[in-house]
Amino acid sequence: MIAVLKTPLSNHIKANTKALFSSLPKTKNELEISLDDLAKQIISGYRLSREEAIILTQIAGEEDILLLCEAADRVRQACCGNVVDLCSIINVKSGGCSENCSFCSQSVHHPGEDSPIYGLKSTEEILDQAKAAEAAGAKRFCLVSQGRGVKYNSPKSTEFEQILGTVRQILAETNIKPCCALGELTPEQAQALAEAGVTRYNHNLEASEHFYPEIVSTHSWNDRVETVKNLKAAGIQACTGGIIGMGETWADRIDLALALRELEVESVPLNLLNSREGTPLGGLLKLDPYDALKAIAIFRLILPKQIIRYAGGREAVMGDLQALGLKAGINAMLIGHYLTTLGQPPEKDQAMLKSLGLQGGETPIATNGL
């Protein structure tokens, strides 16, 4: 069991790490020593402050960023092990969404050409996809629906009841664990999902509270937080993360990670923006893969015990550097296709894991606090 530090950092942390947070070391060797010491402190239970995390964002240059990744990877190994949590998703209802999320091609405010429009898929079709995901190695299968939330749908009860029935059918006919991402939930809906057998629910914060109004105006960041609290109160694990590369600052990224830590979410999907033509963010330059690696590493240092998941955009942004993310703090992957874009074949992902000495499976949640 990891010991939790009871007294301030100044009473524990070594001189090398103190130096890291007073000014960044000038040589590669000094930086490596300082980051190694920081990793040891985090493994022992130290929690990074906002100011310390922002200092880490000043690390620049490919070689130094890779040193940061190595430190994060040591934390990942010590706190999470070498099993990579594999999941898959299905878009059970697509297009025509009332919300104006700037990154999403399913919005009625800016529909993308690559976004199909269809109603809720049948239980049989969803079940077939669940079986295919299980055969590909996924341990969880998430039913994702467009829209602000099922509580806003009309007729309100029919679709939600169908989803509950589909969840029960998946549990009866497969060994894969069904998850859901249906938008905002009332406490009663969260409880109904828990009773049907849903143990994890995806509802991303997407960005920091400060940056959120820049990308969405039809609902608030606090609306999202409320749903996360509702599902956790029902005993459902929170799969809650965000998107990197929407024009946010490094401080915004740190604030998102800290908010996730405060909410004690269990799983953190990190999407790397793969901008879609026709959306307000369609013209943004692609995120630099080394900035993505730096973000992944800092998220791991802030969230040492959480499942941190490669989600949408990893192929488009990381390209041939995808494997480096798995050595920078990532310990989970979404395999197969995404909501409106294609992913790489699961066999390629499995081969990548094997080449890194990692094993696909299901990562247990930390039982001694997040």
From Swiss-Prot:
Metabolic or biological pathway: Cofactor biosynthesis; biotin biosynthesis; biotin from 7,8-diaminononanoate: step 2/2
Protein EC: 2.8.1.6
Cofactor binding: number and manner: Binds 1 [4Fe-4S] cluster. The cluster is coordinated with 3 cysteines and an exchangeable S-adenosyl-L-methionine. Binds 1 [2Fe-2S] cluster. The cluster is coordinated with 3 cysteines and 1 arginine.
Catalytic activities: (4R,5S)-dethiobiotin + (sulfur carrier)-SH + 2 reduced [2Fe-2S]-[ferredoxin] + 2 S-adenosyl-L-methionine = (sulfur carrier)-H + biotin + 2 5'-deoxyadenosine + 2 L-methionine + 2 oxidized [2Fe-2S]-[ferredoxin]
Swiss-Prot/TrEMBL cofactor(s): [4Fe-4S] cluster; [2Fe-2S] cluster
GO terms, molecular function: 2 iron, 2 sulfur cluster binding; 4 iron, 4 sulfur cluster binding; biotin synthase activity; iron ion binding
Quaternary data: Homodimer.
PANTHER family, per the entry: BIOTIN SYNTHASE, BIOTIN SYNTHASE, MITOCHONDRIAL
Functional description taken from the UniProt entry: Catalyzes the conversion of dethiobiotin (DTB) to biotin by the insertion of a sulfur atom into dethiobiotin via a radical-based mechanism.
Protein name: Biotin synthase
Organism annotation: Trichodesmium erythraeum (strain IMS101)
Annotated gene: bioB
